[in-house]
Swiss-Prot record:
Its cofactor is Mg(2+). It is an enzyme of class 3 (hydrolase). PANTHER family: LD44762P (PTHR47980). Belongs to the small GTPase superfamily. Rab family. A lipid is attached at residue 204 (S-geranylgeranyl cysteine). The modification Cysteine methyl ester is found at residue 204. This is Ras-related protein Rab-8B. The keyword Metal-binding applies. One of its GO terms (biological process) is exocytosis. The gene is RAB8B. Signal peptide: none annotated. Mg(2+) binds at residues 22, 40, 63. GTP binds at residues 17-23, 35, 39-40, 66, 121-122, 124, 152-153.
């Protein structure tokens, strides 16, 4: 059967239990919202194909369990991820504080140049906010990561978040292909991991 997409990107949603990762996934993949989701057991995924710059990109989005007892299972999925969204709940201070621990997990288990984005979810619940937008932005700047506040319930910034991450991945792939073409003088293209550019790339376009 003919392939119906030009690229396949594997994305990962990580963060504490209850921050809304599953709700974000369902909002993006099915444009649906459900307040009765139970906590993810282990890992699950959804697929949505989008179009960017005339190319069809199949997004395979993995939703991971936030509980400690599933950590060994979920970290096994970090390695093949091309983009990772770190999600916290703006009404839950602890989930924000733990973003640093999740970043440490990425550094230990994921590819060194994986694209990352921090999402402050549940921004529709501003009356219960414990984490200011400014604190989220500062944390993102400190790590050289893009940042958005989202709401799976109202759908605010959900599309933008996934499209931005996909575009960043595609930009990186295109640059690697161009670099390979220049180096190979027309030879076969081989996409390789470039560890030395990790920090400088993320700081090109903040927030």
């Amino acid at each position: 059967m003919a392939k119906t997409y030009d690229y396949l990107f594997k994305l990962l949603l990580i963060g504490d239990s209850g921050v809304g990762k599953t709700c974000l996934l369902f909002r993006f993949s099915e444009d649906a919202f459900n307040t009765t989701f139970i906590s993810t057991i282990g890992i699950d995924f959804k697929i949505r194909t989008i179009e960017l710059d005339g190319k069809k990109i199949k997004l395979q989005i993995w939703d991971t369990a936030g509980q400690e007892r599933f950590r060994t299972i979920t970290t096994a999925y970090y390695r093949g991820a091309m983009g990772i969204m770190l999600v916290y709940d703006i009404t839950n201070e602890k989930s924000f504080d733990n973003i640093k621990n999740w970043i440490r997990n990425i550094e230990e288990h994921a590819s060194s140049d994986v694209e990352r984005m921090i999402l402050g979810n549940k921004c529709d619940m501003n009356d219960k906010r414990q984490v200011s937008k400014e604190r989220g932005e500062k944390l993102a700047i400190d790590y050289g990561i893009k940042f958005l506040e989202t709401s799976a319930k109202s759908s605010a910034n959900v599309e933008e978040a996934f499209f931005t991450l996909a575009r960043d991945i595609m930009t990186k792939l295109n640059r690697k292909m161009n670099d390979s073409n220049s180096a190979g003088a027309g030879g076969p293209v081989k996409i390789t991991e470039n560890r030395s550019k990790k920090t400088s790339f993320f700081r090109c376009s903040l927030l």
